[in-house]
Amino acid sequence: MAALDSLSLFTSLGLSEQKARETLKNSALSAQLREAATQAQQTLGSTIDKATGILLYGLASRLRDTRRLSFLVSYIASKKIHTEPQLSAALEYVRSHPLDPIDTVDFERECGVGVIVTPEQIEEAVEAAINRHRPQLLVERYHFNMGLLMGEARAVLKWADGKMIKNEVDMQVLHLLGPKLEADLEKKFKVAKARLEETDRRTAKDVVENGETADQTLSLMEQLRGEALKFHKPGENYKTPGYVVTPHTMNLLKQHLEITGGQVRTRFPPEPNGILHIGHAKAINFNFGYAKANNGICFLRFDDTNPEKEEAKFFTAICDMVAWLGYTPYKVTYASDYFDQLYAWAVELIRRGLAYVCHQRGEELKGHNTLPSPWRDRPMEESLLLFEAMRKGKFSEGEATLRMKLVMEDGKMDPVAYRVKYTPHHRTGDKWCIYPTYDYTHCLCDSIEHITHSLCTKEFQARRSSYFWLCNALDVYCPVQWEYGRLNLHYAVVSKRKILQLVATGAVRDWDDPRLFTLTALRRRGFPPEAINNFCARVGVTVAQTTMEPHLLEACVRDVLNDTAPRAMAVLESLRVIITNFPAAKSLDIQVPNFPADETKGFHQVPFAPIVFIERTDFKEEPEPGFKRLAWGQPVGLRHTGYVIELQHVVKGPSGCVESLEVTCRRADAGEKPKAFIHWVSQPLMCEVRLYERLFQHKNPEDPTEVPGGFLSDLNLASLHVVDAALVDCSVALAKPFDKFQFERLGYFSVDPDSHQGKLVFNRTVTLKEDPGKV
């Protein structure tokens, strides 16, 4: 049908010309609306009135199952369905009853077919609603929420026409209140402002009590409760767009509900061939968080189907990271737990003519739109014998595979289900020499564990068709796969292969090098798990891929550490200072608050002796304008001591380098307040401090247009600076690995596992927020 004819048809249905043109841009909607209109005209034998046309548009735009189009059009054309509430009920009914035949008696009862709502009934329902709210209505007049009255009337008269209810409400309110006065036309500023202020107070209180981030971002749990509205309820998988319904579906879902009791079940299924990274933190939060938000359970399932690349250290590290982020799996499972069942199902696929043994080499299978395998139509009995021979080790690696008979969404034909590998498995030993692929294993393991929501990243969308196909081909419970966007960071690589290259070339020490964005690296650097979870909450769950700046993650880290990391003082590049008139014979004990903003969190004690050490940068013989720290004629305060020091003599070595300073001190309250107070240490511990910068110079080190030489050419050679002889106050003497501190004026630091008795090692986690007043 020509576009002009379609435009004329759509406007004749009651659509505005603009709406009709917008509809024409959507080919699927246009085709469905044309078909609905054609069928309606055949039923009516005449033109379609506007009311019927609008319902047909609503049907065409909202109906997912096109098999039901004719059925519903017949009800609309015959006026058995003639209101929007009836259409909504009809669409919900066919969505909830995906199998034929439809029970028309039950359908008509659920959709209000034949129910007549008289004007008198509408009048009575509206009058009753107005009487319930009369006092408030008389006070607020036309500022009252009239939608409340319409909602209450509609609740009583489910099948009443909404327009008729609105007209009746308008008429009765006008009769009660009379015409609008000038005050009724004014905007409701004061009331709105009062409500907004109350909302702000409640929100602020919630943020404090729930420990959320300072910008009052919704927690991921709260977001997932919202996302839950978009997901199907357990057992209602068929309501998900694109879900494939077979004659066995409803019975399988019934059995599924009997097993799970309607419980939400998710899973986090990592491959144990590498360390988890920041993107996995989002997946962990999403899967565990969604289950928790809905009182469900989450499995930790290792996809251990590739024994060549799996190592015990990766299993341990993954379990540790899940626990570190604060989550406890309902059960830790392995794909290898189900190898026997997976093999039995593979045999069944062959018996059903849906899989075959193929001898094409790997390079022949690569790419899309490849030619069909010459072995695709080999006899089922032959494939059974050959698959058994594969299991018994009678083929070399790459000599035979088992392939499934389907074409995936991305055009890939007949994905491999099993391949030969003569590598012993870490759990099953040498029992198997054939191993299932991800495409074969993933959906069937989800089915075995009765997962309700299989949440995975967007790159698996092309595998959704094979996911549904395989479960349905075997007539087993089919979960719903839902894809979301990956989380990436600028100035980072997270690919396992590329991290291995970084380790192999010595660019980083290992998977937990603090310059990486693996979770073990972030933990070693000192990032608190709460900060990572808060960061995931800020990013949220979207379908689009998200690439974030590292400073946003660092802001979350500061928010947490500001409240949890006790203060200490450390000096990185020290300068010796001798106080010539020290006010005590030996030393003084200084009480320093662990958290200066909240002294109820306690104090720690540090010595203050005649010799102290300050940062070399806190002294200048010839200061530039605006320099506020120690200089000739410019005293400076020592934090927490109550004393001010003033320069008397500069001691230099043979090369002219300043070796020490001699100063005098006075009470801070005994004279003019100094321009600045600096940190210091006395009788300190020597320690090693590692200062980290970005590992890469460009935002997208893997982008060949930005970094033509490849990511290894983009390394920042100054990404690590080690201070071997830093000094720190004695309050940290008993610190353990991963303990965290704020070194005053320097940043947040964490104790590294390389620490040993006699020398602590600190990693700088993040710097402090920039102080514009510091010079």
Swiss-Prot record:
Q: Name one GO biological process term.
A: brain development
Q: Which intervals of this chain are the motif 'HIGH' region?
A: 270-280
Tissue specificity remark: Highly expressed in fetal cerebral cortex, particularly in the ventricular zone, inner subventricular zone, outer subventricular zone, and cortical plate.
Cite the Gene3D superfamilies for this sequence.
1.10.10.2420, Glutaminyl-tRNA synthetase, non-specific RNA binding region part 1, domain 1, HUPs, Ribosomal Protein L25, Chain P
Under which main EC class is this enzyme filed? ligase
**Where this protein primarily resides, as one coarse class?**
cytoplasm
Q: Which CDD domains match?
A: GlnRS_core (cd00807)
Return the similarity comment: Belongs to the class-I aminoacyl-tRNA synthetase family.
Would you tell me the protein name for this molecule? Glutamine--tRNA ligase
Gene field: QARS1
